[in-house]
Amino acid sequence: MLSFVSAWILSALVAQTPTEPRAVLLEKIPADAAVVVSLRGIDKVQAHLEGMLTAMSPTWGGQAGPMLRLSIGQMTAQFGTEATRSPFTVAMDLPKADGELPAFAVLIPIEDYRSVLKSLAGTVEAPKLEAVGGGVEKFTNKTGDTIYAYDGEGFIAFAQESDAMVKRIAAKPAATLGSKLSTELREALLGGDLGFYINVAAIQARYGDQIEAMRAQFMAALDQAGDQMQQQGQMNAAKQHYGALFDAAKEAESLALNFDFDKAAFDLSAFLTLKTDSPALASLKNAKTGNSDGLAKLPPGYLFYGYMNTDPKSMQGLMKMNASSTFPGGASGSPAAQKYLDSMMELGRQESLTAMTYGGGVEVLALTIPENVEQTTSAMVELMKTMAQSPAIKEATLEEKVDTYKGFVLNKASMRFDFEKMLGDQAGNPMAAGMVKAMVGEDNATTTYFGSDGKQLVSATAKSLEEAHQKIDQLSDEKAGIGTKPGYQALMSRLPKETNALFAVNAQRLVRFIGQILGTVAGGDPIAPPADMPTEMALFGGSLATHPSGYRLDFVLPSAVGPVLEKGLVPIVQGIQGQVNQ
């Protein structure tokens, strides 16, 4: 079917309209369409994609450019220069029976009906038409395929083999997709070079039983994998995570997303709406977003940066998933863990800023602004006590109120991990060993200083009290924070400031982390990236924001990340492959 669509698109795009018409085409499509695809224009997408790849890597652009231009050249030679310039939209229904191809139609904003028919037929003269009712006509192209076409007002719709969607469009539906879509869904569909709309509720209604059967099979496979690897705790966490995704699909109404190719970055933006009677939608009535500008004060040099603005229920859900991977049987298998989870509902809303890195151990610097400071500080103490009971912890000590610095009353928690128990049945897996060793360090230990000043809670891993002081000082030195870095500014300028969760990944630190893991897997020292890897910090990341009708998701990959991957990660991977092949 996709090959048919491609052929039709190539043959039918024979004129250009003076303005962006994709929004107008939405007014021609039935509101209950299952899937809609919207393309800005083949020539524009080709130019944007080639420009983005070249900005990320002249090598990548040089490899992709000729192939893209060749395709455009072939289309131009066969169908004319206008063939590549017009935007188009594809509307699709769900199949009516198993094995039946879905009915769909291509819509293009062109008024020269006869020229389009000649291109579709592959003939010099317009094909002989036969009326099939409702203003729809059919003809046979030179390869013997039946084509159905409709000459609309300022647009043309056509399809192959099935006239169902073309007839629905020709009937001028009273309820159209254009009138159905909210502003957020419309922007998500049309905001980039390539957009998709999916009627999730219709798909769930049609295939709900099959989806539920897939869920049961998938969960059973996770249980089996957990038993075989003796990692049931991690599998329980995975089951909760994927189970939540299956549940979300049941409550979802519509999804729209777009991909945008720009010289400055690759952008993905999506919006998911929920059913009006769904519990998830009811929970969003009191949802609040927060401003992520505080991330700018965090110091550079970390692998991961994160902002979160969460209500107690959401925080409890996150901690419950963490407990599933930390304790056998999850929180229910640890009274202390369950007690801590129960206390989460009393803490109120929390905003947190976190910087974290791996490699030689976990290094964390976090600042939390809680609604209830005293309860949150007490909960942090209880969390450290609870973690000490995890089978993965060999030794643990907690010293309360060991120091006061800049108003923060600091506690000290020290833990030594049981490397073998963390690996479980994966003790003989070099990749697993490399991952764990990178996280816990050579001495398998970590020390965290944490406490509040009555307004906010700070947490910092450090080998000494003096180092903890230095990290706390970094939080107040905004002139030295990542906010001054071009890589941070490039990322944040393309993400919404008001959000519930935002993450940013340091590309250089990611390359070094991967090099450390692969070096361990190969039985040697960490593999350092080549000296010519760019040193200017490049960040990529994304965000998730609640909305009264659903959720907005954004992801940004700035072009500056490309040279880091090309000159840093690619040589490391190639070096490992060379060792394996020797």
Which ranges hold each PLM region?
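Bacterial N-terminal signal peptides
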Residues: 1-12
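Structural boundary/hinge residues at secondary-structure and domain interfaces
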Residues: 16-143, 182-362, 368, 374-412, ...
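Short, solvent-exposed coil/turn segments at beta-strand boundaries
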Residues: 30-31, 101, 150-156, 265, ...
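Long compositionally biased, domain-poor regions of proteins
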Residues: 81-93, 339-363, 373-374, 386, ...
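A conserved glycine-rich beta-strand in the N-terminal activation segment of trypsin-fold
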Residues: 140-219, 440-530, 534
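Composition- and surface-driven signal marking solvent-exposed, interaction-prone regions
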Residues: 170-172, 271-273, 282-287, 320-321, ...
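A cross-kingdom marker for long, charged
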Residues: 288-292, 451-453, 539-582
